[in-house]
């Protein structure tokens, strides 16, 4: 009995220690297919390597939040950091700018990463 209680206490201490680890998110913005002006595509924002799990992600068109944005389920890696994919359909052209804005406890404020159509 004592052994199982001790193991439970150790497990709780270990799990509570995981909460103290904070990792800033890595942000990648890319299109599903090579961009062609006037042709429908998908804009993706892959956010990875962050901890804790609470995070805000917005896809932007000319600085404004885009509608109909979907996302994957929150998942975690072997190192217990989290990752997500946000995506939406869009039609690129020469005049519009697209970006992904992320806010997380590890950041001093929201971080915006622009989509580079040449990547």
Curated annotation (Swiss-Prot):
Family matches, as PROSITE patterns: IG_LIKE, IG_MHC
Signal peptide limits: 1-20
Pfam families: C1-set
Disulfide bonds: 45-100
Domain Ig-like C1-type positions: 25-114
InterPro entries associated with the record: B2Microglobulin, Ig-like_dom, Ig-like_dom_sf, Ig-like_fold, Ig/MHC_CS, Ig_C1-set, MHC/Immunoglobulin
Top-rank taxon: Eukaryota
Record-level GO cellular component terms: extracellular region; MHC class I protein complex
Subcellular location: Secreted
Keywords carried by this UniProt record: Disulfide bond, Immunity, Immunoglobulin domain, MHC I, Secreted, Signal
GO biological process, one term: immune response
CDD domains: IgC1_beta2m
Family recorded in the similarity comment: Belongs to the beta-2-microglobulin family.
Function text: Component of the class I major histocompatibility complex (MHC). Involved in the presentation of peptide antigens to the immune system.
Subunit structure: Heterodimer of an alpha chain and a beta chain. Beta-2-microglobulin is the beta-chain of major histocompatibility complex class I molecules.
Protein name: Beta-2-microglobulin
Source organism: Chlorocebus aethiops
């Amino acid at each position: 009995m004592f052994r199982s209680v001790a193991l439970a206490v150790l497990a709780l201490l270990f799990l509570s220690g995981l909460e103290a680890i904070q990792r800033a998110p890595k942000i990648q913005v890319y299109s599903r297919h090579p961009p062609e002006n006037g042709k429908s595509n998908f804009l993706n924002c892959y956010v990875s390597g962050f901890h804790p799990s609470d995070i805000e992600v917005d896809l932007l068109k000319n600085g404004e939040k885009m509608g109909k944005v979907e996302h994957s389920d929150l998942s975690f890696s072997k190192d217990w950091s989290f990752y997500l994919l946000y995506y939406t359909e869009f039609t690129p052209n020469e005049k519009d700018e697209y970006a992904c804005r992320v806010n997380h406890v590890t950041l001093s404020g929201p971080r915006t990463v622009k989509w580079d159509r040449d990547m």
